[in-house]
Amino acid sequence: AVFKFRERDPKVIPRQVRGNAILELAWTLIPAVILTFIAFPTVAAIFRTQAVPVKDALRVKVVGHQWWWEFQYPDLGITTASDLHLPAGRPVTLEIASTDVIHSFWVPQLGGKRDAIPGSVTRITLTADTPGEYYGQCAEFCGTSHANMRHLAVVQTPEAFAAWAAVQKEPALAPPDGSPAAAGLQVYRTSTCVGCHTVRGVSGGGIGPDLTHLGSRKTIAGGILRNTPENLARWVRHAPAVKPGSLMPEQQLSDPEVTALVAYLQSLR
């Protein structure tokens, strides 16, 4: 290009290109027609997902926090976090909000994304047909650990969902006397955990996730870790090392105390 279009005799006028009307019309009109045909079903689908669902739809309040998702089932009296349980084949209306900054709720395999906006509620209606696990990710940059703000959508058969819901409605069971979990309960009660977390019947903190049935969840730490004793111990010891910016402070607990606390939290099923 440098050689071909180098400066030459200024008296010689180069060939003038006036354009090609047929070509220009073609590359303008053909995409316009295609986009028009795509727009009709797309807009219709958008309005369908925002419409009021049938009366037997399950309501779930989805609340974004830095950097985890809270799920409330107001008609069932259930509050949980990280794992969103849904019954297969039943319409679900997600009412999405935020307590701090703008987030965006998204499960790619189940539907479109919706912003979670402080002081506002957005909605999306979906029906998950196939039982399974579907990963979700916050789709709006929301701070230091935006990439670590995940969750798991667990789609269950109606019978399995009903069984899960029945357990979730109950308060936490007291661990047997003399068990490692009982020792962990004492650690929980005397640590900073009670100031931020709720375990129904034990503590009523409202800053962090509800832990009443933590042991039954598949994920912890805002969806980034599988719920295993090893991962839970890592999280309890120093959450900011796992998720930068986490509000949960480093716990000044001995190894035996961590082991006991993990045993208690894992027993909350």
What is the predicted function of each stretch?
Residues 268-269:
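Short, solvent-exposed mixed-charge patches
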Residues 1-194, 199-206, 223-237, 242-244, ...:
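Non-transmembrane, membrane-proximal soluble domains of secreted or membrane proteins
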Residues 217-220:
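Alpha-solenoid helical repeat scaffolds
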Residues 264:
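Active-site segment flanking the S-adenosylmethionine/decSAM binding pocket
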